[in-house]
Regions:
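Start-of-helix signal in alpha-solenoid helical-repeat scaffolds, especially tetratricopeptide repeats
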Residues: 5, 25, 29, 61, ...
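Amphipathic helix-loop-helix modules that constitute alpha-helical solenoid scaffolds
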Residues: 1-52
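Boundary/linker segments of alpha-helical solenoid repeat arrays
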Residues: 62, 91-99, 127-135
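Alpha-helical junction/boundary sensor with strong preference for TPR arrays
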Residues: 18, 58, 88-91, 126-129, ...
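TPR/TPR-like (Sel1-like) alpha-helical repeat modules
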Residues: 61, 112-130
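Structural motif corresponding to the intra-repeat A-B loop/turn of tetratricopeptide repeats
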Residues: 38-41, 74, 109, 142
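"A position-specific structural signal for the A-helix of alpha-solenoid helical repeats
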Residues: 26, 30, 66, 70, ...
């Protein structure tokens, strides 16, 4: 808790400068996720807005994926799916988080075959044995 409080104070000080950079936006996203430990829920609208700023100013494949998932968590699942679909096939072909996100959003949209294929692809790209085991359990429960 003390480290989170210290991080929050640092983030507030950086925010007061009104010159958000890549790392400040990422830290703000992580801070929003930390709120779940205290409130029991993630402020997904805030997370989506922060990812929107990150995508606008510092676009990356990871930022686009995070934004897509955050949109889905605010109830805009189709919009999130559309963002995933807009990413370059070359950029995501071997990017495991993309395939996990695609599986998650596909399942929420009722695209179960596509979701299963995406999860299989994610499993094939996963090197960490614990993450792989988690994805295999998810696949078995799908």
């Amino acid at each position: 808790r003390d480290l989170i409080d210290e991080s929050e104070a640092t983030l507030r000080a950086a925010s007061a400068l009104r010159q958000p950079g890549h790392f400040q936006l990422e830290a703000a996203i992580q801070s929003a996720h930390c709120q779940r430990a205290f409130t029991g829920h993630t402020p997904w609208r805030a997370v989506a807005a922060l990812y929107q700023a990150l995508v606008e100013h510092f676009p990356s494949t990871g930022a686009h994926i995070g934004h897509a998932v955050a949109l889905a968590e605010t109830g805009q699942v189709q919009a999130g799916w559309d963002r995933l679909e807009a990413l370059s096939a070359d950029a995501v072909a071997r990017h495991q988080p993309y395939w996990v996100a695609r599986a998650h959003l596909g399942r929420r949209l009722g695209r179960h075959d596509e979701a299963g294929q995406a999860l299989d692809r994610a499993i094939g790209l996963t090197e960490d044995p614990r993450v792989r085991a988690h994805l295999l359990r998810a696949r078995a429960g799908a």
